[in-house]
Structure formats: structure tokens, C-alpha cells
Design a protein with these regions (language model features):
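Charged (often Lys/Glu-rich) extended helix/loop segments that serve as interaction or gating elements
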Residues: 2-147
Length: 147
């Protein structure tokens, strides 16, 4: 790999974010669980490799911090995007950005648990373009045959 190719790959890695919406919160005795609509099928690295991705509250970052795990709605013990994070006390409907996911988005995503893949959006300043459509349930069963 040339230096320029490496630079391009590095930029892609740093440029991508996974934008997710808070569904609800569970309050535990030692920490909270923030359940979001993204899951391990959207970003497998934290569950598979215990990788660290910074998580930023997109809305209302001025709230007090809570210690929380950020987890998906898939019924798996490994369905987490971040563990033991100090994060503003976000509420349902608010958004979180999981950072540095550009090189790991669609290429490592799956349809696990019959979940359609998320769309990909290219943002250039104030402009944006959908570069990969959100999958539908029809996409999931395309190619299947009745027997």
C-alpha cells in the first residue's frame, strides 16, 4: 500500500460516524444502559474486538454525565457499542454519534436478526447525498424461493 492509499483509507476511517437514536434508558444500581436503535449488526467491532469508538451526544450535551453502557436492541449479551462511558444523560429520541466508523460501516455490517442495513450518507459541508439506500425487508427476502 502506498503512502497516498494509506492516507485515503485513514481519512475514510476517521470520517465516518454511525448516527443512532436513543430508544430508552434502564437505570441500574451501578450504571445505566442506554438502548439505541443501532446494533452489533451495524457496527460489530466493539462486540467482536472490544474496539473503542468515541460516542458523542449530538443533542443536549449540556446535561450531567452518567456512567452507562450503550447497547443495541438485539437480544444478545454482546450487543453493545460502548461500555462504561461517561455520557450526558440523553433521553429517548435524542441522537448519539459513534465516531470513527467510516472504514467499518457497510463492509462489516450484516442482516443478523433480520435487521435491514442502515443507509450511508455522504456529507459535504451543508450538502448531503444518500450513497447507499436503507435496506428494506423486501431486500432481505429477495432471492428466496417458496418450496
Amino acid at each position: 500500500m502506498t503512502k497516498e492509499e494509506f492516507r485515503q483509507v485513514s481519512l475514510g476511517f476517521q470520517a465516518g460516524i454511525l448516527l443512532t437514536t436513543v430508544l430508552y434508558r434502564k437505570h441500574g444500581p451501578e450504571k445505566e444502559f442506554i438502548i439505541v436503535d443501532a446494533a452489533m449488526n451495524d457496527l460489530i467491532r466493539p462486540a467482536l474486538y472490544k474496539s473503542h469508538h468515541e460516542v458523542i451526544a449530538v443533542t443536549r450535551a449540556d446535561r450531567p454525565l452518567v456512567l452507562a453502557d450503550i447497547v443495541g436492541p438485539v437480544c444478545e449479551s454482546g450487543d453493545f457499542l460502548a461500555r462504561d462511558r461517561q455520557i450526558p444523560a440523553v433521553e429517548p429520541g435524542e441522537r448519539l454519534a459513534v465516531c470513527t466508523t467510516g472504514a467499518y460501516g457497510f463492509v462489516l455490517s450484516s442482516n443478523y436478526n433480520a435487521r435491514p442495513r442502515a443507509p450511508e450518507v455522504l456529507v459535504d459541508g451543508p450538502d448531503f447525498t444518500i450513497i447507499r439506500d436503507r435496506e428494506s425487508y423486501a431486500d432481505l427476502i429477495r432471492g428466496e424461493r417458496a418450496v
